[in-house]
């Protein structure tokens, strides 16, 4: 089995930038054009949301995007077919960037865990982030994901104690994901001086206890914040700001144009 794209990327001596996108948002047919636009605009990893009706870790922007995606017909099966088409270059240029899926346990259980891992690999997925899967209870899932060559990412928060940072670091396949602040996605106010200082101290603490790379997300909105986070972390994730920028799009073409326009401001 060949090494997956995420593993290949994290071996490089570079800081990386991850885009979070909710499929078929804001209009049906947007996904493949947006993936092409992001890749051509220099994205390093594409994180695709698996829409869920009760996304406990997501703020209003991503919740609204998830509800839109569900209304537009996005299921896990539909999403995996979009990934397959992206990898094959059907409906867009062939997408080669690593693809990470982010979603919650219940839909995966309903789909069938083993079937999901098999189908995700076959479609061209590289990794998985399941926010409500506790690392302490993930041994079976981790073993199976490893068997399929899929990267698994676990979350660290500002209140995670040092010994648990070390556990999460050891269990995350290639990198862990640090929540910049406690709360939900898109609600962080990283421009606040006190918040920024607290985040810096927290990321320094993670660096002391992590042997692998880690990325940081929640509330990152612009190039200045991306570059600031790169001082402490190996990667930055931008999601809610991207979704807000494209939210008023009326066509897939406009969505892709705006996605590219926004992403280029981060580089």
Curated annotation (Swiss-Prot):
Pfam families listed in its UniProt record: Trp_syntA (PF00290)
InterPro entries xrefs: Aldolase_TIM, RibuloseP-bd_barrel, Trp_synthase_alpha_AS, Trp_synthase_suA
Protein name per the record: Tryptophan synthase alpha chain
Keyword Amino-acid biosynthesis: yes
Organism in which the protein naturally occurs: Pelodictyon phaeoclathratiforme (strain DSM 5477 / BU-1)
EC number: 4.2.1.20
Keyword entries, A-Z: Amino-acid biosynthesis, Aromatic amino acid biosynthesis, Lyase, Tryptophan biosynthesis
Gene3D superfamilies cross-referenced by the UniProt entry: Aldolase class I
Biological pathway: Amino-acid biosynthesis; L-tryptophan biosynthesis; L-tryptophan from chorismate: step 5/5
Protein's gene: trpA
GO cellular component, one term: cytosol
């Amino acid at each position: 089995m060949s090494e997956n794209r995420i593993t290949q990327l994290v071996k490089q001596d570079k800081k990386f930038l991850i885009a979070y996108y909710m499929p078929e948002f804001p209009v049906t047919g947007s996904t493949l054009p947006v993936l092409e636009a992001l890749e051509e605009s220099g994205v390093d990893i594409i994180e695709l949301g698996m829409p869920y009706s009760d996304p406990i870790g997501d703020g209003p922007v991503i919740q609204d995007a998830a509800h839109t995606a569900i209304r537009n017909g996005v299921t896990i099966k539909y999403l995996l077919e979009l990934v397959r088409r992206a990898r094959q270059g059907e409906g867009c240029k062939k997408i080669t960037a690593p693809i990470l899926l982010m979603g919650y346990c219940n839909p995966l259980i309903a789909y069938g865990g083993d079937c999901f891992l098999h189908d995700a690999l076959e479609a061209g997925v590289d990794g998985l982030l399941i926010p409500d899967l506790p690392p302490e209870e993930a041994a079976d899932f981790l073993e199976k994901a490893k068997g399929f060559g899929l990267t698994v990412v676990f979350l660290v928060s500002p209140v995670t104690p040092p010994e648990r940072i070390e556990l999460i670091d050891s269990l995350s396949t290639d990198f862990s994901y640090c929540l910049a602040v406690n709360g939900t996605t898109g609600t962080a106010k990283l421009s606040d001086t006190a918040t920024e200082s607290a985040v810096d101290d927290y990321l320094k603490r993670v660096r002391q206890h992590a042997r692998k790379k880690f990325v940081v997300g929640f509330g990152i909105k612009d190039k200045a914040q991306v570059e600031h986070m790169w001082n402490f972390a190996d990667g930055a994730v931008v999601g809610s700001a991207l979704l807000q920028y494209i939210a008023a799009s009326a066509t897939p073409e406009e969505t892709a144009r705006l996605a590219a326009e926004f992403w280029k401001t981060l580089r």
